[in-house]
Amino acid sequence: MEIDKELAPQDRTVTVATVLPAVPGPSPLTIKQPFQSEVLFAGTKDAEASLTIANIDSVSTLTTFYRHASLESLWVTIHPTLQAPTFPTTVGVCWVPANSPVTPAQITKTYGGQIFCIGGAINTLSPLIVKCPLEMMNPRVKDSIQYLDSPKLLISITAQPTAPPASTCIITVSGTLSMHSPLITDTST
């Protein structure tokens, strides 16, 4: 029995994976729309949050009538309030892909995770901005198929043992969406 014998002849051509070519013709018209959402009033108690950007109300409302939507920019802002100087609050934030198993308790163990002390005598009273590294995850928030690696924000809050009467900071998510291919819907009602 010959082991080296080829049972079925194979084409010796080397094939290279290619990217699908762009569809000929003009590219679709896009609409760029800024958005901002208050996602957490923090500081009155310890809290954790995990927010997928595609599911935030302002994003889903803006993308309702479009087939495709991508993030052009994305950031989280931590806004100190009047209570911050008296009641310092620790805020941890981290941007991860939506399918990441990382939890808010693991922010400091994750690349890009940051911890801030909001308020107090010598700590920041200015808004803090943490940009999302969109080049490290999928910026698409709406498409013909569902993606599992769009941006997700992890937040961890550690409040003072003596809780303040109101929030020490407000956390907002802001950015710019690029949308195209309007859905055809009946608007007569």
Curated annotation (Swiss-Prot):
Keywords: Acetylation, Capsid protein, T=3 icosahedral capsid protein, Virion. One of its GO terms (cellular component) is T=3 icosahedral viral capsid. It is found in: Virion. Its main location: virion. The keyword Mitochondrion does not apply. It comes from the Viruses. The modification N-acetylmethionine is found at M1. It holds the Pfam family Tymo_coat. One of its GO terms (molecular function) is structural molecule activity. Self-assembles to form a T=3 icosahedral capsid composed of 180 copies of the capsid protein. The capsid encapsulates the single-stranded RNA genome. A pentameric unit may be lost during decapsidation. Belongs to the tymoviruses capsid protein family. This is Capsid protein. It comes from Turnip yellow mosaic virus.
